[in-house]
Amino acid sequence: MSFRLTRNLRVLKPFDYKTIFKHGKIIKGQYWQVLARKIDTPEPRLGLAISKKVHRLAIDRNKTKRIARETFRTHQNDLNHWEFIVMAEHSKPAKNSIMTNDLLHLFKKIITY
């Protein structure tokens, strides 16, 4: 499996977002809130919902999205059969490694849930 984040690994359609929001499991961390839903296809999928209410500046929203995409991309082999929507939580700025570890912890918690 390649480590590219191709189009089929992303949640793109509004219907898919609504389904995950309606039927997904929710887990909150210090920096993230993750909604997840088990799916039949072997590839994991990622959707992002980073609100202006949480991060007012575009630079902060973009940093948050980059961290979420990179964490998902590098660990996608461990996340098979799941769809995720990642949202940012209100928090103070943190280092990338701390935010990455928090998101990884939430992914692992959902998979073993």
Swiss-Prot record:
Q: Does GTP-binding appear among the keywords? A: no
Cellular component terms per the entry's GO annotation:
ribonuclease P complex
Catalytic class of the enzyme = hydrolase
- Write down the InterPro entries for this protein, in alphabetical order: Ribosomal_Su5_D2-typ_SF, Ribsml_uS5_D2-typ_fold_subgr, RNase_P
* Keyword tags: Endonuclease, Hydrolase, Nuclease, RNA-binding, tRNA processing
Q: Quote the catalytic activity from the record.
A: Endonucleolytic cleavage of RNA, removing 5'-extranucleotides from tRNA precursor
Its signal peptide is: none
Q: Identify the SUPFAM superfamilies for this entry.
A: Ribosomal protein S5 domain 2-like (SSF54211)
What superkingdom does the record give?
Bacteria
**Please, one GO biological process term?**
tRNA 5'-leader removal
Keyword Protein biosynthesis listed: no
Q: Name one GO molecular function term.
A: tRNA binding
Q: What is its EC number?
A: 3.1.26.5
**Assembly notes:** Consists of a catalytic RNA component (M1 or rnpB) and a protein subunit.
Family, per entry: Belongs to the RnpA family.
Q: Cite the PANTHER family for this sequence.
A: RIBONUCLEASE P PROTEIN COMPONENT (PTHR33992:SF1)
This molecule's function is given as: RNaseP catalyzes the removal of the 5'-leader sequence from pre-tRNA to produce the mature 5'-terminus. It can also cleave other RNA substrates such as 4.5S RNA. The protein component plays an auxiliary but essential role in vivo by binding to the 5'-leader sequence and broadening the substrate specificity of the ribozyme.
Name used for this protein in its record: Ribonuclease P protein component
The source organism is Vesicomyosocius okutanii subsp. Calyptogena okutanii (strain HA)
Gene name, per UniProt, is rnpA
